[in-house]
């Protein structure tokens, strides 16, 4: 039978999702735990691979097993063998035609960025950081230029293995929350920015490369129209440096309601 799992993880201690020799990865930790609980080797396929240091709030995987066990048993049993920074949130039997990656209509990511004169401490590794104030309207205008189907070569890592740089970016939403009293030394208020990205798929480092450009625009180093120029140039060298992975979260994939998966993974009304 085929099982689907929803997984959350803190990516700080891992060299990304995908299994690699001689380094610690989320996939290896999950498959080791599943294998111990199932008492047979388990190979998983995920909805979206994350890089080193990137977190997952609702990664979805599927695997095949000859065992017929209750869903709750898979959750409790697998979690019993997982490290504290990885957890199975839900388990569900799915049709053999379900594929965690190929069945996904889209993927959702969020980048959480602390704007503060002082670097993060408690949140270190879980938020990005910028020590200058950002212009929301300029960043949102620039982000809107990216929405739609485009060649995203300017935001593609040199190691990217995707067959095509053309992707459909459905939305970039930018908001600022949690303003606190002004910093006593510098006189302005720290806040948390949230950048949410929705696309059919993403290139390697695509979001972090876009983030580097949005922050440069938000700081006034470039105009919003620079984003249009980058799209036309299709040159990675012309864009800003890759932003840190710390504040990047894979919110999860989006599936058709017909698969019967938990609500957080289901396409909203009117999708796409």
From Swiss-Prot:
It holds the Pfam family PseudoU_synth_1. GO terms for molecular function: RNA binding; tRNA pseudouridine(38-40) synthase activity. The keyword tRNA processing applies. InterPro entries: PsdUridine_synth_cat_dom_sf, PsdUridine_synth_TruA, PsdUridine_synth_TruA_a/b_dom, PsdUridine_synth_TruA_C, TruA/RsuA/RluB/E/F_N. Substrate binds at residue 109. GO terms for biological process: tRNA pseudouridine synthesis. Its EC number is 5.4.99.12. The active site is at residue 51. It catalyses: uridine(38/39/40) in tRNA = pseudouridine(38/39/40) in tRNA. Signal peptide: none annotated. It comes from the Bacteria. CDD domains: PseudoU_synth_EcTruA. Transmembrane segments: none annotated. Keywords: Isomerase, tRNA processing. The keyword Isomerase applies. It is an enzyme of class 5 (isomerase). Formation of pseudouridine at positions 38, 39 and 40 in the anticodon stem and loop of transfer RNAs. Homodimer. Belongs to the tRNA pseudouridine synthase TruA family. This is tRNA pseudouridine synthase A.
């Amino acid at each position: 039978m085929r099982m689907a799992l929803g997984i959350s993880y803190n990516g700080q201690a891992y060299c990304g999702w995908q299994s690699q020799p001689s380094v610690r990865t989320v996939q290896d930790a999950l498959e080791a735990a599943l294998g111990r609980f199932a008492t047979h080797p388990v190979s998983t396929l995920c909805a979206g691979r994350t890089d080193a240091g990137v977190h997952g709030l609702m990664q979805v995987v599927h695997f095949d097993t000859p065992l017929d066990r209750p869903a709750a048993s898979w959750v409790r049993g697998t979690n019993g063998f997982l490290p504290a920074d990885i957890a199975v949130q839900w388990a569900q039997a799915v049709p053999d035609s379900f594929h965690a990656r190929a069945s996904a209509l889209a993927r959702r990511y969020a980048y959480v960025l602390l704007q503060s004169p002082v670097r993060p401490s408690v949140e270190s590794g879980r938020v990005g950081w910028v020590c200058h104030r950002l212009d929301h309207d300029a960043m949102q205008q620039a982000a809107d230029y990216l929405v739609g189907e485009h060649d995203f070569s300017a935001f593609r890592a040199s190691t990217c293995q995707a067959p095509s740089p053309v992707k459909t970016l459905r939305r970039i939403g930018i908001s600022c929350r949690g303003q606190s009293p002004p910093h006593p030394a510098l006189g302005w208020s720290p806040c948390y920015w949230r950048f949410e990205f929705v696309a059919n798929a993403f290139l390697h480092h695509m979001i972090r490369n876009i983030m580097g450009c949005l922050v440069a625009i938000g700081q006034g180093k470039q105009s919003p129209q620079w984003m249009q120029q980058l799209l036309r140039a299709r040159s990675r060298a012309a864009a800003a440096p890759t932003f840190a992975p710390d504040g990047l979260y894979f919110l999860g994939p989006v599936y058709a309601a017909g698969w019967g998966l938990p609500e957080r993974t289901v396409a909203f009304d009117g999708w796409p």
